[in-house]
């Protein structure tokens, strides 16, 4: 049992012991069907906190020779498959998190990755193998000795691609990946490859290290969509179990429409259930900085589209021009596509339209607006709670003043006196209202029912009905 070579099942055991656990073990059925096939290389690119690393820990526990996971899987959905034990703990597993190496070894990261794995190989195989040979040859030698194939798992595989501007380093890294996944030796020793990242695979000229991977993204993930994020039925069951209001949960954390499935942010839902409180659990400076980076880019129509989405609207996005690289953003569509992959926008692939998925993400946008050219918008949003209070108190004069302020602020970036702009103004004027009220855009004619404060924070979903 090692850290990188044949790891334990500690990660999956911890997940199973957590306060909130949702069974995603049927993902392993999908992977088992791809062992030793042309489809054995899987690339999963999803936003952070959507269960990529949890899945990697589960894959460790299932395939690794370094542990016995019989009891961990015996009461799971996977166990309903009669031969689910066929591949359990039968493979040599290598598991790497590239981001942890990047933090410590930027200058010689590839050398260090190999050193750390080779150290564990040496403990296991001692003088049986010539460890001075190329890394893929060493893997082949281990396979020759043991007759046990490898399952290779790489978390944050794209960390170097996203963070390095050194083309030579990127080239060497891709050569290293080629040795793992496309060399002649890998045709024998590799049973399965599972790599995760934030962005889809970047097409780099003259590089073919990863062109044999099957990609699953925030745009399209069939047939494994349901395994990354919580499905609506799973969230309903959690709400019953933890006595939490489903509609509020939906408004706060739903909105990711992937392959027609409504997917929820699993980390935030779990936190809300455990803490019995609806709040933004995506509060960190990196998320605010990421949003701010893209919404302040100087591309025609970008500010209008952001404003429309902040007000609950949807905008058309051409995702095909995005080069899967944050450093080559060249248009409004590229900027919005980047936000989709980062999880800050939802996307309807049928209609090819994007939207702010839920109230949690809306609050992250609110924080991101505090600097730069959006500061005037941020100042207007800061008056939303006051407007809400004055509306409740029936202070018509102050309400009129605040609505006028909102009108002057928001119509400066929208079509003045356009009907949709006026609707946008009212929505933005009451931007923080969803934290306290059910939001109903239009009441049916003659319906005199009032919208009331709900102490349980029961909210309507932000996802546009036309999405």
PLM-predicted stretches and their roles:
Residues 134, 444-448:
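Short acidic loop-to-helix transition motifs that present clustered carboxylates
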Residues 1-418, 433-437:
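Phosphate-binding site recognition
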Residues 203, 448-449:
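Short, well-ordered alpha-helical microsegments
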Residues 429-445:
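A short acidic/basic microdomain associated with nuclease active sites
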Residues 451-454:
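Conserved small/polar residues in nucleotide/adenosyl-binding loops
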Residues 458, 462:
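Catalytic core segments in nucleotide and nucleic-acid processing enzymes
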Residues 464-466:
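Polybasic/polar functional segments that serve as interface/processing modules
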């Amino acid at each position: 049992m090692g850290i990188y070579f044949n790891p334990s099942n500690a990660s999956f055991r911890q997940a199973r012991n957590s306060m909130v656990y949702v069974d995603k073990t049927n993902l392993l059925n999908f992977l088992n069907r791809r062992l030793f096939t042309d489809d054995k290389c899987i690339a999963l690119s999803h936003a952070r906190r959507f269960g990529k690393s949890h899945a990697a820990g589960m894959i460790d526990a299932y395939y690794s020779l370094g542990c016995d996971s019989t009891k961990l899987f015996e009461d799971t959905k996977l166990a309903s498959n009669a031969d689910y034990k066929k591949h359990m703990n039968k493979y040599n597993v290598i598991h790497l998190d590239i981001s942890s190496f990047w933090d410590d070894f930027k200058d010689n990261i590839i050398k260090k990755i190999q050193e750390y794995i080779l150290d564990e190989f040496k403990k296991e195989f001692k003088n049986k193998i010539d460890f001075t040979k190329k890394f893929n040859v060493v893997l082949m030698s281990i396979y020759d000795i043991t007759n046990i194939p490898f399952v290779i798992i790489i978390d944050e595989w794209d960390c170097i691609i996203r963070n390095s501007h050194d083309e030579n380093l990127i080239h060497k890294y891709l050569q290293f990946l080629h040795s793992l996944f496309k060399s002649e030796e890998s045709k024998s020793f590799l049973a399965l490859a599972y790599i995760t990242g934030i962005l889809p695979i970047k097409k780099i000229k003259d590089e073919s290290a990863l062109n044999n991977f099957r990609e699953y993204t925030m745009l399209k993930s069939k047939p494994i969509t349901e395994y990354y994020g919580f499905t609506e039925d799973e969230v309903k069951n959690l709400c019953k179990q933890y006595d939490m209001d489903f509609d509020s949960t939906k408004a706060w954390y739903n909105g990711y429409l992937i392959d027609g499935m409504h997917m929820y942010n699993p980390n935030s839902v779990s936190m809300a259930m455990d803490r019995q409180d609806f709040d933004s659990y995506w509060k960190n400076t990196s998320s605010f900085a990421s949003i701010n980076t893209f919404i302040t880019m100087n591309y025609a129509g970008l500010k209008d589209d952001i404003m429309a989405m902040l007000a609950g609207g949807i905008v058309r996005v051409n995702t095909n021009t995005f080069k899967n690289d944050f450093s080559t953003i060249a248009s409004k569509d590229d900027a919005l596509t980047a936000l989709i992959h980062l999880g800050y926008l939802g996307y309807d692939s049928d209609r090819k339209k994007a939207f702010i998925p839920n109230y949690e993400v809306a609050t992250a946008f609110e924080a991101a607006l505090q600097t730069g050219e959006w500061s005037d918008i941020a100042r207007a949003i800061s008056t939303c709670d006051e407007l809400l209070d004055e509306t409740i108190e029936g202070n018509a004069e102050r309400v009129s003043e605040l609505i006028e302020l909102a009108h002057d602020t928001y119509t400066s970036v929208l079509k003045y006196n356009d009907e949709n702009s006026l609707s946008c103004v009212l929505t933005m004027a009451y931007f923080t209202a969803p934290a306290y009220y059910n939001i109903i855009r239009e009441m049916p004619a003659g319906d005199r029912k009032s919208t009331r404060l709900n102490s349980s924070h029961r909210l309507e979903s932000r996802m546009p009905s036309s999405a």
